[in-house]
């Protein structure tokens, strides 16, 4: 299957994952993965912003954290999930509606690894996040096209974009990532627009 077909098939997974996140469905029933594996995806209610929580094979993962104005609501939702720490936190791009609440996540939880695209022009919100990452004693791991993040037991993130080191629009830094879990996959895109889509399909 070529890359374009893989991306298109992954888009179908978005519908499944949206329903799973809404209804809190455990997505382990029909996937070809070990019986002790698990996957749960929840889209958090952060108002006019984005945040997704993933539990896979014992790993707690957060993709974006919504705006700072809704960080209290985000933390309440995360607390209800009995999270001790995050194995992985991903910031897709520097817009406030995606990463504004992330500083408070770092204050509340231990974070073991932080990924973000390499940003050449930034925002004050992103600078505050970078400081929080350093205060945690972490180094930012660059998120870029071609990399794979192993999540164990047949689960992994494949990153298709960004493929360049500099873009005019901040949205174009948004990674297009496929989460594979057994024979099922789900696509995460941040605020990726036409340019990122073209890069992913190239």
Name the predicted role of every residue range.
Residues 2-202:
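Non-globular, low-confidence helical/coil segments that flank catalytic cores
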